[in-house]
Amino acid sequence: MKIILATSNKHKVLELKEILKDFEIYAFDEVLMPFEIEENGKTFKENALIKARAVFNALDEKQKKDFIALSDDSGICVDVLEGNPGIYSARFSGKGDDKSNRDKLVNEMIKKGFKQSKAYYVAAIAMVGLMGEFSTHGTMHGKVIDTEKGENGFGYDSLFIPKGFDKTLAQLSVDEKNNISHRFKALELAKIILKILNKG
């Protein structure tokens, strides 16, 4: 069984390939011509399913027998911002780049009079294939701070300190991050489903 990732985000592709290294993984653009997918769901799960369905439906009939489309939709929910940016995390600033998104998050938090806040990451993984549709979830709790720290990671990692740590995700090694991340937790559950489907 082969897995096609329904993302063109290079950071996500690397992270997903690392965590799912027991499987034969292909990035979206290794199999299909890239195309835009409108994420108009109201939850992380809905958006993950929209992406996985779109990619699976773009495969030809032979490919559909060989591939499962796997998608991740994830984001950060900040308490003092009433759960925002949430499903809009990737495009929070309107510009769609990580630095602008981080700057906006910090500015919104400071406007409300806070230098830090409880926050949590959410990841929803969706899998779509001939055998049906499946989804898993993972969360990681901690806090966001108003100063970026660390060079690793992407997204909001340089602002997020996981519970039980005194470093941001961007200060942790790839292995340290992958062992505690929301995406890792969701993918560990997804692996169980994928192994069952592979036997089926």
Swiss-Prot record:
Binds 1 Mg(2+) ion per subunit. InterPro entries: dITP/XTP_pyrophosphatase, ITPase-like_fam, RdgB/HAM1. It comes from the Bacteria. Signal peptide: none annotated. It catalyses: XTP + H2O = XMP + diphosphate + H(+); dITP + H2O = dIMP + diphosphate + H(+); ITP + H2O = IMP + diphosphate + H(+). The active site is at D73 (proton acceptor). Its cofactor is Mg(2+). GO terms for cellular component: cytosol. GO terms for molecular function: dITP diphosphatase activity; ITP diphosphatase activity; metal ion binding; nucleotide binding; ribonucleoside triphosphate phosphatase activity; XTP diphosphatase activity. It is an enzyme of class 3 (hydrolase). Pfam families: Ham1p_like (PF01725). The keyword Membrane does not apply. Keywords: Hydrolase, Magnesium, Metal-binding, Nucleotide metabolism, Nucleotide-binding. Its EC number is 3.6.1.66. Mg(2+) binds at E38, D73. One of its GO terms (biological process) is nucleotide metabolic process. Substrate binds at T7, S8, N9, K10, H11, K12, S74, F154, G155, Y156, D157, K177, H182, R183. Homodimer. PANTHER family: INOSINE TRIPHOSPHATE PYROPHOSPHATASE, INOSINE TRIPHOSPHATE PYROPHOSPHATASE/HAM1 PROTEIN. HAMAP family: Non_canon_purine_NTPase. NCBIfam families: RdgB/HAM1 family non-canonical purine NTP pyrophosphatase. Belongs to the HAM1 NTPase family. Pyrophosphatase that catalyzes the hydrolysis of nucleoside triphosphates to their monophosphate derivatives, with a high preference for the non-canonical purine nucleotides XTP (xanthosine triphosphate), dITP (deoxyinosine triphosphate) and ITP. Seems to function as a house-cleaning enzyme that removes non-canonical purine nucleotides from the nucleotide pool, thus preventing their incorporation into DNA/RNA and avoiding chromosomal lesions. This is dITP/XTP pyrophosphatase.
